[in-house]
Every structure is written in C-alpha cells, then in structure tokens.
Amino acid sequence: MHPLLLDVTERIRQRSKATRAAYLAQTEQAVAQGPVREQLSCTNLAHDYAASSDTEKLILKQNHRAANIAIISAYNDVLSAHAPYRDYPQQLKKALAACGHVGQMAGGVPAMCDGVTQGQTGMELSLFSRDVIALSTAVAMSHQVFDGMLLLGICDKIVPGLLMAALRFGHLPAVFVPAGPMPSGISNNDKAKVRQAYAAGEVGRDELLHSEMASYHSAGTCTFYGTANSNQMLMEIMGLQLPGSSFINPNDPLRAPLTAAAAQRVSELTALAPDFMPLGQMVDERTLVNAMVGLLATGGSTNHSIHLPAIGRMAGILIDWQDMADLSDVVPLLTRVYPNGKADINAFQQSGGMAYLMRELASAGLLHTDVKTIMGNGLEPYFKEPYLNSEGTLSWRPAVAESLDLSVLAPAHAPFMREGGMKLLQGNLGRAIMKVSAVPDDRWQVEAPARVFTTQEAVLNAYRNGELNCDVVVVLKYQGPKANGMPELHQLTPALTNLQEAGYRVALVTDGRLSGASGKVPAAIHVCPEAYAGGWLDRVQDGDVIRLDGHHGELTVLAEGFAQRPAHEPPVLSATGVGRELFAGLRKLVTPADQGALSVGWD
C-alpha cells in the first residue's frame, strides 16, 4: 500500500472517530432487532401484502425463509440513461421469485436531466434534487417491511441521493443496478466543435440541434465521462454494484443476466441469509478513499468533490477537500475519455474497462483491497469482467492482461499524468476545486485582470459584444448553494473555449459548479465561502488581478488593500418560478460546498 494512502485513510478515521462510532452504534442496534416485519402488527402486514399475488403473499408470510426486497427506481421518460429502467422492476421481481423471494416497487424518486436544464432556470433545483431524492428514498423505506434494497439510478444527483438515504438504512444490504451507456454517436469532440461554432455565430440553431441529436440519440447514459458515468465508476470501485456491470450497453446480451444477478445477490446478503452484509458496515473510510482514488485516476466529475463529503457524512465519515488534494499528488491519471480526451466511455469499456483499471490501481498500492463489497470480503472479484460462457450463463473472467487501447486506458507504470485529475486551490479567496485532467499543462496557470459578473447571461452578452477579447479572469459570483442552489455553468464553456483558442489567457472563478463534461478552460469552481454568504469572492472588483495556479494550488487576488475591503450585504436574488420558491428553506439550511452542500441533516 502506498504510505500516503494509508496516512489519508488514518487521518479520516481519526477525524471521524466520534461520528462513525455513533453511526455504527445506531446501525448495530437496528441489526440486533432483526427483520422488522416480525415486529409489525398483522394489520400493518396485511396492508403491505394486499396488492400482492397469491404466490407473493405465501412467500411473504414465510418471514424466516423469504426476503422482501425494496426496489427504488428513478425511472422517467426524460432521462435517456434511465429509460431502460421502465421494465426493470418486473425483471427484478421475476429474478427474485426464481430464488424464492419477493420484490416490491417501494417507491419512485425524482430524477432531473442536467442536459435538459443546462443554462435554464430549472438548473437551480439540480443540486437540491440530490437531497430530495435522499428524502424520497427514506419515505419509501419507512414502511419497514424490507430486508434489502435494489437501487435503480445512474445520473448526476440520483446515485448520490440514493446512496445517502441507503446509508441511513445501513442495517440493510443494498445493491445498485446500472443500465449502461448508449451506443456511440458522433464523437464528443465533433459535438463540442459545433457548440463552439454556434457560440461564435458561425452556424445556426438547426445545425446545432442536428449535431446534438446525433450525439444524444438513444436510450442509455450519455457517452462522455461526466457525472453520470463517474457515478457508475464510483459504485463499482466502492463495491456496490456487480463487477464489470457499469458500462455494458442497454441492449447488450449481458445486460439482462447482470440485472437478474443483482437481484439474486441482494437476496443472498440479507439477515435471512448466511452472507449477511449490511451496507453501513460495508461502506467505511477505506471504501471512500477508494472512491476518491477512482475519481482522481479517471479525471472524473468535479461534482463528486461535493457528493463524496455528503455521502461520507451519512455514514459518520468526515471527508475534507484536503484529503482529495493529498491523494491527487500520488494517484496517476490512467484514462483519456472526453472531456479528458477524444474517446468516449464505450471506448474505455472496449479498452479493458473497470476490471483493468482497478487491477492496475491495486497493483500500484493505490486501492484498499481488504474492503467489504457486495461480492464479499476483498476487492479481487472486481479485477474480473463479465461474459456469457458457452452455455449462455453469466460468468466472470480475469481482466485483459494489457490495455487494448493505450490512447484511452493506460497502465499504472505509464500514466497519462503522474498526478490526479483534480486540484485544491487555496488563497485569499478561500478554497476552490480545479479540474486539470482536460486542461493543457501550459494553461494551468493564469494571471489576468478580473471581470466580475452576477449572471451567466451577463457573461455571454459581454462575450458577444467583444468585451472579453483579452486576457481575463471571468468572476461569476452569487452561484453558490445559498444564493441560487449552485447551478452548473456549462453553457459558458463554448464561449470561454473560443477565447482561449483565440490565444487569450482565460480562466473562470466562481462559487457555482461546472458540468462533468466541462474542463477545457482552467476554472476555480465551488469557491468557499460563497459570495452570498459573505465570502471574499464578493469583494473582487473589475480590474483586480487574480492568479489561478493549478501547479501550486493557488487562488489569490493580487490587488493592494484587498484584505481591508469591507463586506457588504448581498442583493436580494429572484427565487420564484419553476418551483424555486419551494426550495427557500433548503437554501437557508444548506452547508458550504466543501461540507457536501447538504440541506438535510440532524446536527
């Protein structure tokens, strides 16, 4: 094991000693009570069984032999990634019945597509939807008639929200069930070029729509390596879904057997089975360190610098951005998938996929292999890939010995970068996250005068008017969680990329977020404290020189007398329309981004 990995893990363990102990005590108390169905009244149980088939009723009455598994689904028709889930509940119920168990559709959770809301007002609900999903999952599980969970979610806020809630029911086992990415359409690189041409006024809306629909063209996850596919990587490297199941296309012959196997596996992990493995005991500080390593090694979405601290807190584990920063110094970048390269997630899968990646990281001493997973003790089952044997049965075989495409997936001894894809920046503006995996090395440092904006529209208007045709640090404030829910600002990427390609030194500094698909332009995002809460970002003025330095982890305003500038009251921001007024309470409660931007909790 790499000594720094051990140091970071121990630091997290010590920091979390009290909160983790309290969490485990709560979980162990629930485990000791045994299956809750035995404690419910006959009237309670009759209500639960009422709509079940006669066969299911017979199974459910056999408490000591048959498990009742909750199915929580984030299906809707809007998300292409979740479209395959439409028929999953019946598939899972059938697989469970074949094992002598019952599955009940316990609840549906909301799931919004950030691609649909990007640049729109609805994006201000995106981050909070994670916590709403956690609450919705808790409501579904509150019936207390279940012995385990099957969690159906893929996209940006859905997986973190499901996992956060599942950890609060940590006395039960849980298995995530993926659906896979859509087949490749036009390349993400070609799509980005059309977006830049549209931002420059060189092509019209019809050409842009044609390009977008050629990229996002069928059921399945978007093929770039954004937050959705980062979610899938994380669930696999954390051992929460079946080995090799993340990136199998929806219509691949492997997909249905993997779905059935997930149902069978969760039934084998309940308290009614010999291999009982409650989620709360499975996910510990080692699991979360593995998650951070995976994120850094793949150049994953910066959104997880927010989600992982939130997930950790649900299990009593306290993650700090410094943990990620320290790991980034020793974890190499092993993948080149858009926006970190030209390939898509299907090319990653074809090059060797998760089994090769995890084996390489483990061989370099960069993963805890002694963790618990849904496959049992140890991470070794995840160094294998699924296939259908000669009898058509689902089996696993060792990962490929060598990467099948070294331009997409590199071995640990010859990485694309010697350090990870994410950096922590610190200075007199506070703390911020910078994704470096997609930024050319000569763009990691920018020192230029600031132009301060409070809306995305104002930035784009200045771009169209030629006001940003210079070396510039675009400062966009009042985009933090308390201000307006911390929307993603991906619509700025084509314009800023055009400026960068025109030869200007350009950077973005904001307390907002960027899409997992972003990354070509150097950006200090998630600035904490946020401007609306009195952070130093609110005191930056036009013309202040700002230094953003990914090499040395610096974010500094160089203006004389900056430290003496007084704070001032933030403006009253519009928060009505598209349901935003319903989230006013969450904006008041939400914690800073570096603490997970949590609007739910009990502290």
Question: Regions from the language model: what does each represent?
Answer:
Residues R130, L152-C155, G352:
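N-terminal glycine-rich "phosphate-gripper" loop used for MgATP/nucleotide binding
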Residues M141-L162, V175-V177:
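A short, small-residue-rich loop immediately preceding and capping a beta-strand
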Residues D87:
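Acidic/charged coordination and interface sites in well-structured regions
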Residues M1-D77, A81, Q90-V109, Q120-G122, ...:
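Catalytic or ion-coupling anion/metal-binding cores of large enzyme and transporter domains
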Residues R130-T137, Q144-G148, L460-L468, V475:
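Contiguous domain-boundary segments centered on the initiation and propagation of an alpha-helix
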Residues A106-Q144:
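N-terminal small/polar loop signature for handling phosphorylated ligands or for N-terminal nucleophile
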